[in-house]
Amino acid sequence: MAEPSLRTASPGGSAASDDHEFEPSADMLVHEFDDEQTLEEEEMLEGEVNFTSEIEHLERESEMPIDELLRLYGYGSTVPLPGEEEEDEEDMDNDCNSGCSGEIKDEAIKDSSGQEDETQSSNDDPTPSFTCRDVREVIRPRRCKYFDTNHEIEEESEDDEDYVPSEDWKKEIMVGSMFQAEIPVGICKYRETEKVYENDDQLLWDPEYVMEERVIDFLNEASRRTCEERGLDAIPEGSHIKDNEQALYELVKCNFDTEEALRRLRFNVKAAREELSVWTEEECRNFEQGLKAYGKDFHLIQANKVRTRSVGECVAFYYMWKKSERYDFFAQQTRFGKKKYNLHPGVTDYMDRLLDESESATSSRAPSPPPTTSNSNTSQSEKEDCTASNNTQNGVSVNGPCAITAYKDEAKQGVHLNGPTISSSDPSSNETDTNGYNRENVTDDSRFSHTSGKTDTNPDDTNERPIKRQRMDSPGKESTGSSEFSQEVFSHGEV
């Protein structure tokens, strides 16, 4: 609904407006044309406004009664007065605070039905059918909901505040007369001057009167004398020394006189009984087997391996055993001392890890086999290189590739070139060379007489080292003999 302009309002109450909306043409919308003339016309019209007429209208409206002023601006007579508006606002606030949402909904339904009746009855009336009160009543549930949400937000904000602990949680050291309990007279069994127990305290040992070296000598002497009387201990003597409380107590009672303390220990029954608990060799072996099987579970060790001893004696023996040479031997055999419960973050199955460690240990202990070299492959390759070089003279082959292949076949059938030959005056002798070939099979053919004569020139060299190394040392000599050999072979014309 367009509001009427104040400058065009007539006193009679009719409202008319000379303003009209500017509707751009299609060309303006397509080409985004901005008509500056319209802007200039609007500025000119604004400049021609007479402010004196507006002031007169405002003065006239100030003198009008409220009913006429409402009718002037299009409102009916149903608008309540300011006093009534205040009362309605107070009622609305009370309704909102009470939180009666159901009643608010019913009132909204009734108001909407009343509005429908009013619209039907006042069809001829040009004034609108709704009033300020109706608008407030429609908006009222929203206001209540808004205030309720604000209340919830405030509660949430209170919950989100930083927690500040009270000072009561701080602990105080309760020392002093103010923290002492007041015991009634009839509950306490003892008086203030009366002792709780009858026996006096006895000093068992005082280390300030005797040097440590003298105490160690005294304990060694006491242990030696008792061992001579009762038998040697299964644990060998070492740098360790066992604290004998009974012997130290006897030394205190004798005013730290070592000779008198040793004499009393010899006739003391209690000390003799204590020394009777010497572990035998069988008990030590059973204890070590139990420690290997059950670990440090001394209850299982005592129940299954060392039944003649108590759990306390097993624990005491364990700490003595760890200081002895017997423990060093046991640790070397089983690596018990090195297993310090190592943590492995990436390992979940410790049994697989144990198997891997055992396999690696066995593989490291196994001797590695010596490297084997294939002499046959090297000798065959050297033989082929030698024959290829012997069949060429000045870079040109004598009889072509056919002669080379024939020579290789005859060489394989007739003689082993890598084996040294031994010279002999008797060609029919049954002596064999180092490779197991008979001389009579090799020297019968007249074609191989030159090679045998060539190799017989230096029998000492051939016997001392193999022909392979001789080829590398003197390639000139071998190449000469082999070339003569190839010439004799190819001269017969055999292919």
Swiss-Prot record:
Where's the SANT domain?
274-326
Q: Does the keyword Nucleus apply?
A: yes
Keyword field: DNA-binding, Nucleus, Repressor, Transcription, Transcription regulation
Q: Where is the composition biased (Basic and acidic residues)?
A: 462-476
Regions of compositional bias (Acidic residues) in chain numbering: 83-94
Q: Where in the cell is it found?
A: Nucleus
List GO BP terms, alphabetically. chromatin remodeling; negative regulation of transcription by RNA polymerase II; regulation of DNA-templated transcription
One GO MF term on file is: transcription corepressor activity
Stretch list, region Disordered: 1-25, 76-131, 356-397, 416-495
**SUPFAM superfamilies assigned to the protein according to its UniProt record, in alphabetical order:** Homeodomain-like
Residue span(s) of domain ELM2: 171-269
Gene Ontology cellular component annotations, sorted alphabetically: nucleoplasm; transcription repressor complex
Residue ranges of the TM segments: none
Q: Where is the composition biased (Polar residues)?
A: 120-130, 387-397, 420-440, 477-489
Give a short account of what the protein does: Transcriptional repressor regulating the expression of a number of genes. Probably functions through recruitment of histone deacetylases involved in chromatin silencing.
Report what the protein is called.
Mesoderm induction early response protein 1
What is the source species?
Answer: Xenopus laevis
